[in-house]
Amino acid sequence: MADAQELIEVAAEVRQIICDLAEAPEIVQSARDGVRVAEDRLSRAEAAAYLESSGTVREREAHVTVHVAGLRDDVEVAKAALQYARDKSKSLETRLSGLQTLAGLLKTEMKL
């Protein structure tokens, strides 16, 4: 049989998730900004590397590839951070929904 303590624990977790969800849009936006900045740096570095190289088009492209590899990694890391932030937000929403259902069931059980 459900008791008040279980309901209190569920309510506390719901409050925490609501607080986390309130911060989620800022976290996602910050991650989006990180992707934009990383892509901008990569684009500028590619242009600069191409201009400072010489030779055939293939040689220039190879030069660019070598010189901006780290920045490409930075873009991928930024994209992964954005995806993580989105997934975390969805996970919190799902957990909140489950806890709200559980709270309703506990309340009903307590009334019986």
Task: Describe each region flagged by the PLM.
Residues 1-2, 108-112:
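Short acidic DE-rich linear segments
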Residues 1-24:
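Short, charge-rich amphipathic alpha-helices with coiled-coil/heptad character
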Residues 28, 32-35, 39, 75-106:
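Long amphipathic alpha-helical coiled-coil segments
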Residues 28-60:
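Extended alpha-helical coiled-coil "stalk/arm" regions
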Residues 47, 64-66, 94, 101:
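A periodicity- and composition-biased signal for non-globular, repetitive helical segments
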Residues 54-81:
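Short, glycine/alanine-rich amphipathic alpha-helical segment
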